[in-house]
Amino acid sequence: MVIGLTGGIASGKSTVVDFLISEGYQVIDADKVVRQLQEPGGKLYKAIVETYGLDFIADNGQLNREKLGALVFSDSKEREKLSNLQDEIIRTELYDRRDDLLKKMTDKSVSKNFDSKSQGKNLSVNKPIFMDIPLLIEYNYTGFDEIWLVSLPEKIQLERLMARNKFTEEEAKKRISSQMPLSEKQKVADVILDNFGTIEALKKQIQRELARIEEQK
């Protein structure tokens, strides 16, 4: 079973992912995969240099993600350009990792440390795997048995983003408005995890859904 996990910026997906991993579930983290692909010599790194030149390469040779992010979030045309550039590379890599993990589980092998966030627990072949993809709905990723959405009111999302990233209100609103509204994503999701309360309340929702899946086996 493959579950797609998504949500808006500062919605709390990382909290969900950390909890799932602590419970022994395997999570393919799209943001982490992208960062790996953006390392010097990686497929995305090469594609960005070929498209933008060295303007977004820092003195240490690393990709200047902050500078690149500022460009794409302030210019919708550049955002679309970069998204199209990266989409095929990222999509292929994510599906390859999913297929690799499913094969290992089908072969009943025990996989450790597939993701660097893993706590090193032995993973049961009967457990679902999760794919944490921020733009899962926007880019029409498929192949999931269920889609889980981490959601919260926009006011709380705005406050959390400002606090987490030290953004001004204007900067935070611009980032949020660049994404599909959570209200629209809710129409597609099979499970909605409400993250406007405490972490413990969020964990209880996750445990309830995991128990439901276990009962369906």
UniProtKB/Swiss-Prot annotation:
ATP binds at A10, S11, G12, K13, S14, T15. Keywords: ATP-binding, Coenzyme A biosynthesis, Cytoplasm, Kinase, Nucleotide-binding, Transferase. One of its GO terms (biological process) is coenzyme A biosynthetic process. The keyword ATP-binding applies. It is an enzyme of class 2 (transferase). Residues 2-217 form the DPCK domain. It catalyses: 3'-dephospho-CoA + ATP = ADP + CoA + H(+). It is found in: Cytoplasm. Pathway: Cofactor biosynthesis; coenzyme A biosynthesis; CoA from (R)-pantothenate: step 5/5. Its EC number is 2.7.1.24. One of its GO terms (cellular component) is cytoplasm. The keyword Cytoplasm applies. InterPro entries: Depp_CoAkinase, P-loop_NTPase. GO terms for molecular function: ATP binding; dephospho-CoA kinase activity. It comes from the Bacteria. Belongs to the CoaE family. Catalyzes the phosphorylation of the 3'-hydroxyl group of dephosphocoenzyme A to form coenzyme A. This is Dephospho-CoA kinase. It comes from Lactococcus lactis subsp. lactis (strain IL1403).
